[in-house]
């Protein structure tokens, strides 16, 4: 098991593509390789460089060079219409009486940004896969966030998404993890 981390320009993609080269030489087909990165930019760069280096077609040969969110989105058959958008968060805020001007996931790297601290805490707990109230209790709350209000808003957000048939990026990953039929990669 090898995990390669590092800042931009340190050779992560080159190192990984050299490994891909070895796997291809060992007879592993490109579609049996899962190449996942944190950002869309990095995934696109890796796919482009792999296609050039190995004479492959990005669409047909390298469908699994992508971000985890993109992979889950694709495997679950999701559409953009089924994803929470800023307008949905604003509607949720109006229904609950909390101000929300900004709330969205980056399509580049899946990070969540909101001007509402309650939503930020709910999202961060989900990303860390921590119980919401345990996460709340573990942090030094500088901003006045009420524990009970946080819990109720999190429950209401779940209900809102369910009623509307919407998901956020965290839901995608959670749903994917419970999915029975995963691709069986020879190399991940």
In which residue ranges do the predicted regions lie?
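P-loop NTPase Walker
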Residues: 1-81
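Soluble or luminal CAZymes and related metallo-dependent hydrolases
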Residues: 42, 88, 149
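DNA-processing P-loop NTPase/helicase core
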Residues: 79-87, 144
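Conserved phosphoryl-transfer catalytic core
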Residues: 86-108
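Accessory N-terminal region flanking or inserted into the helicase ATPase core
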Residues: 1-10, 14-15, 32-34, 104-188
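SF2 helicase/translocase NTPase motor core
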Residues: 58-61, 67, 86-93, 155-158
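Hydrophobic alpha-helix position signal
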Residues: 23, 93, 161-162
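Alpha-helix C-terminal capping segments
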Residues: 50, 76, 93-96, 176-181
